[in-house]
Structure formats: structure tokens, C-alpha cells
Amino acid sequence: MSNQEVDFQAAHLESPMKMSPSKVSMNHGAFMANMQNGYSPTREGATAGSSSTRVIEALHAQIDSLTKTNLDLTVQSNNLLSRLESSNNTQSKHLESISTLKHENDNLGLMLSRKERRVRDLEQQLSQLKHSYEEAAMDNKTMRHQLQTSGQREGTLENQLQQLQVQYDALVDGQKRYREKYDLEVEELKKSLQDFKRDNEMYLTKNIQTVVSNNTALQTKINQYSGKYKNLESLSQQHMQELSREVEGMASKLDLAKWEKLYEESRNMAIEYSEKTNVPLSPSFLAQHGAKSGSRSPSTSSSSTFVHPSQIRVPKVRHSSSSAKRSSFYGSNVSVPGGTVPGVKQPSASPTTPSSGGLPGVRRSSSVRGSSSSSRNSSGDLASAESAAQSQKGASKNSANNKKKRMSSHSYSKSNGFSFGEP
């Protein structure tokens, strides 16, 4: 054999072909059967030629050695293939186990992460529980203190309750006694009230006729008095109207400007007399009449010395001249007082002036008509003193008549035995 063939076979021996274990086992079974039977394909052709016997035998020896080597290698290969197959199975199992373990490892990693999160959550819960425990411990301590305080207060309240119970029992007993006492008093008052009602009914029954008769008589007297009062009121109105007409008529006949001129002259004469004789005038005279003023206008004097018509008495001499009036005013039997001027308020007393009646022909009257003063004009409408005196006399007569009527009615009621009190 050449070296190439040996190298080729050695290469084939060094790197056997990859065969499946099933095919190797089938060829290996046939080869092993031929080897056991002593069958060799080269031995059949050895008889053909004697010259190449040695070469053939050498080749047969090599073939046998190679066959043996092949057989050993086949056995070894078979063993290796079986081992490879078992290794492949083991590897596949290991791969499966590795994948399973990887999956389990992933699962365990996820579980570990979940457990770690759970641990962190539990740690937070533990911290919260610790905080809650501390708060609960503080609350428990506070509650214990409050419990002790409440126990002490409960004891105090129990003592107070016992005291109040004793006081309440005493009040109930006192109320019961008072109730019994007041029930008896109420019963007595009811009996007294019933007796009083019965006596009052008897009294009213006895005196009802007297009350009715007195009421009838009283109503009759009231009606009579109303009629008399109406008649008296109508008469009074008529009298006042008549007086008003008379006063207006007398005031229309009076010359006010002449009386003002007389007043100015008399006042100036009194002041001149006091200056000539050095006799001081009274302060009341000066306060009422003032100083000497001959240049006063009639309008000013009339406004400042306005006299009510009822305060002036006109002299009885009619149609006389101013000289006659002046002579009668300055007569020897007439004195000029300082404080009796018409229309001016009179003082109480004057030490330097005589207390005569006033100016001649003028007399004060107590009856004053307020309604007639509003109807006077600035031309000097003043009433006469005679009308004022007549009105005063008429008013006094009416008042006297009214008094007589009242006295007669009062005496009549007394004579009849009628009274306004209880019968």
C-alpha cells in the first residue's frame, strides 16, 4: 500500500465519520458475525497466485490488525456513541433543568421582589404600629389618669348624691305636710267662698229692687239736669252775644285819640310838678309811664297804651266839648294818681301818690272779654264802662241764679232721700 492510502485510512481512523447509533449497531452486528465465523474475503483469492502470497499475507495481517483496530475503534465508538447519546440525553435534561431553574429563578426573583416590597410595607406598618402603640400607650396612660380622676369624682358625686337624696327625702316630707296643710286651707277657703256666695246672693236678692229704683230715679234726675244744663247754656250764649253787641256799640262811640292826648298831658303835668316841687316820683310810676315825652305820635301812644274795652268807664255827660272834659278832669275834688292809667298794669301801692280811684270818668272792671278784643281795629274801638258793669252785674246774677238752682236741686234730692252711695 502506498503512503497516501495509509494516510487516508489513518485520517479516517483519526476522524471517524459521524454515524447515527442505529446504523452503526446494524453494520456492527454483521461484521462481528463474519469475524466469529473466520470469514475473510482475501483468503479466497490467495490460491490464485503464489508470487504475491507474501504480500497478500502481509496485507491480510495488516487488514486483520486494522480490522481488529477497527473493531476496537468500533467498540470504542459504540461506547462513545452510547456515552454521547447518554450525554446528549443528560444535556437535554440539563438544559431542561436549566430552563426550569431559570424560570424558577425568575419566579423566585419576582417572589423575592414581592417579598422585599412586602417587607418594606411591613416595616412601614411596623413603624406605624409602633407609633400607634406609643399613642395608645399615651392614651392608656391618660385614660388611667382620667379613670382615677373619674373614680375620685364618682366617689364625691356619690357622697353628694346621698346628701341630695337625704335633702330630697326631707323636701318630699315637707312638701307632703305642706300639701296636707294647704289642702285643708283650700277646703276651708272653698267653704268660706261658698258661704260668701250664698250670703251675697241673698243680699243681692234682697236689695235688687232698691238698686233698680235708685237707678231709675238717678236716670230721671240726670235727664232733668241735662235739660236744665242745655237751657242754661243756650241762655248764656244769648247773653254773651247781647253783651258783645252792646260792647261793640259803646266802643264805636268812644273817641280814643282824645283819651290818649289826655293821658300824655296828665303824665307830663305829673312829671313837671315833681320837678318843680322836688318831689321824687315812685320807681313803679317811672317804670310804667316812663319820662316826659311831649312829641310822641298818636299812633305810637295808641299802640303802647291800648286799653281793653271792659276796663274803661265813659262819663255820663254826652256831647260835651274837650274843654268841659278837661275841666272835669282837673277839678279840685279829683287827684291824679301815679299808677291808675287805662291799659297799664296797676302797682300794689305807691308811697308818694294818693290811692284814689283813677282818672275821672274811668273805672277798672274785673270782667274781661277776650273774644271781643280780637274784633277791635286800630281806630280805637273800645267798649264803655257802663256796658262792662252791666255785663258784670248780669254775670253775677246768672251765677247767683245758678247757685240757687243747684242748691234747690241738691236740697230736693236730700228731701227725697236719694243718695249715690250704697243702699
Curated annotation (Swiss-Prot):
One cellular-component annotation, GO: endoplasmic reticulum membrane
GO molecular function: RNA binding
Region: Disordered, residue numbers: 284-423
BP GO annotations: endoplasmic reticulum inheritance; mRNA transport
Endoplasmic reticulum among keywords: yes
Membrane topology note: Peripheral membrane protein
Cellular compartments annotated: Endoplasmic reticulum membrane
Coiled-coil stretches: 101-260
Broad class of where this protein is predominantly found: endoplasmic reticulum
Protein keywords: Coiled coil, Endoplasmic reticulum, Membrane, mRNA transport, RNA-binding, Transport
Compositional bias of kind Low complexity: 293-304, 320-332, 347-380, 391-401
Composition-biased stretches (Polar residues): 410-423
Similarity comment text for this entry: Belongs to the SHE3 family.
Functional note: RNA-binding protein that binds specific mRNAs including the ASH1 mRNA, coding for a repressor of the HO endonuclease. Part of the mRNA localization machinery that restricts accumulation of certain proteins to the bud and in the daughter cell. Required for the delivery of cortical endoplasmic reticulum into the emerging bud.
Name under which the protein is recorded: SWI5-dependent HO expression protein 3
Natural source organism: Lachancea thermotolerans (strain ATCC 56472 / CBS 6340 / NRRL Y-8284)
